[in-house]
């Protein structure tokens, strides 16, 4: 049975960051089942909050955080031969404070290594859609990469491309940047490592998803480094919130294909007289239910996990 959580409440765990969807807590040393310095590990909780147009909406999607967490964990495990990840294997229940309903957190939280974020969004695109399509229409390029003339919306690219963006604060918009700008921001060596890892993961995941009847149009990854400079993939991985997944049997070049994400919500919001600033409008129950069904189907098709 899926739980619903809009805001984490974990007395005794210092809140480090409250994002659009995830709450991040430091884990005091006394709560760790391993001998380590305080602050080396974090508890990341995927709530059921939903954001659209960079605004967190007032209505949760019940169980969404649990679904996202399970999809991420599936992909972290499936790709660990390609790139180490932030997971530690420490049991979530062992670090949660006493006196709370731990069932709210067991399936939606993970204990992770504490890493230094690289500071950019690492995006791989295999198809021309979204902001990439808009950039191409305007300039013929995406993130400074020249593409062939005459491509259509949602068309498969000759080869997947790395198209990083800035990592904006909550309420602000990420901006696409070219590779030279990425080098200036994080350094040439780290930029190349992130680019290579992003494309390596995308190639692997796109092949696997296709075997499940799903096209992986693009995905956004986040990376961090430890004190020794080792690179890890972190945060979330290949979820419907960070990726565009399209059903193969509904894919058609020249249109924006249906996807396993919050597109239903975005489409609904576009019909409203709303200026896309906070506070966001409430959602009809039908939109909430149909959006949840999309996330549930993605989990089932990709990971083979049934939750209903």
UniProtKB/Swiss-Prot annotation:
<dbReference type="GO" id="GO:0005524">
    <property type="term" value="F:ATP binding"/>
</dbReference>
<keyword id="KW-0067">ATP-binding</keyword>
<dbReference type="Pfam" id="PF01259">
    <property type="entry name" value="SAICAR_synt"/>
</dbReference>
<dbReference type="InterPro" id="IPR001636">
    <property type="entry name" value="SAICAR_synth"/>
</dbReference>
<keyword id="KW-0658">Purine biosynthesis</keyword>
<comment type="similarity">
    <text>Belongs to the SAICAR synthetase family.</text>
</comment>
<keyword id="KW-0547">Nucleotide-binding</keyword>
<comment type="pathway">
    <text>Purine metabolism; IMP biosynthesis via de novo pathway; 5-amino-1-(5-phospho-D-ribosyl)imidazole-4-carboxamide from 5-amino-1-(5-phospho-D-ribosyl)imidazole-4-carboxylate: step 1/2.</text>
</comment>
<keyword id="KW-0436">Ligase</keyword>
<dbReference type="GO" id="GO:0006189">
    <property type="term" value="P:'de novo' IMP biosynthetic process"/>
</dbReference>
<dbReference type="GO" id="GO:0004639">
    <property type="term" value="F:phosphoribosylaminoimidazolesuccinocarboxamide synthase activity"/>
</dbReference>
<dbReference type="InterPro" id="IPR028923">
    <property type="entry name" value="SAICAR_synt/ADE2_N"/>
</dbReference>
<dbReference type="GO" id="GO:0005737">
    <property type="term" value="C:cytoplasm"/>
</dbReference>
<protein>
    <recommendedName>
        <fullName>Phosphoribosylaminoimidazole-succinocarboxamide synthase</fullName>
        <ecNumber>6.3.2.6</ecNumber>
    </recommendedName>
</protein>
<dbReference type="InterPro" id="IPR018236">
    <property type="entry name" value="SAICAR_synthetase_CS"/>
</dbReference>
């Amino acid at each position: 049975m899926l739980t619903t959580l809009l805001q984490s409440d974990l007395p005794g765990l210092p809140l480090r960051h409250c994002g659009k969807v995830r709450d991040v807590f430091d884990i005091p040393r006394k709560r760790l089942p391993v001998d380590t310095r305080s602050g080396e590990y974090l508890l990341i909780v995927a709530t059921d909050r939903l954001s659209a147009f960079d605004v967190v909406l007032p209505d949760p999607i019940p169980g969404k955080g649990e679904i996202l967490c399970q999809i991420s964990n599936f992909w972290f495990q499936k790709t660990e031969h390609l790139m180490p990840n932030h997971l530690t294997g420490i049991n979530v229940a062992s670090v949660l404070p006493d006196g709370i309903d731990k069932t709210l957190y067991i399936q939606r939280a993970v204990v992770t290594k504490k890493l230094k974020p690289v500071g950019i969004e690492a995006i791989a695109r295999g198809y021309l859609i979204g902001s990439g399509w808009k950039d191409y229409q305007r300039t013929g390029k995406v993130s400074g990469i020249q593409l062939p003339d005459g491509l259509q919306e949602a068309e498969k690219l000759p080869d997947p491309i790395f198209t990083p963006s800035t990592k904006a604060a909550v309420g602000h918009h990420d901006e696409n940047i070219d590779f030279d700008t990425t080098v200036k921001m994080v350094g040439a060596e780290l930029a190349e490592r992130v680019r290579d890892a992003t494309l390596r993961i995308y190639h692997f995941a796109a092949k696997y998803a296709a075997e499940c009847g799903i096209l992986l149009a693009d995905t956004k990854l986040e990376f961090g480094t430890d004190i020794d400079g080792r690179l890890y993939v972190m945060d979330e991985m290949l979820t419907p919130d960070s990726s565009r997944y399209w059903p193969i049997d509904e894919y058609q070049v020249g249109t924006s294909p249906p996807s396993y994400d919050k597109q239903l919500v975005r489409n609904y919001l576009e019909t409203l007289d709303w200026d896309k600033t906070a506070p966001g409008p409430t959602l009809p129950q039908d939109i909430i239910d149909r959006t949840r069904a999309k996330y549930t189907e993605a989990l089932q098709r990709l990971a083979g996990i049934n939750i209903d």
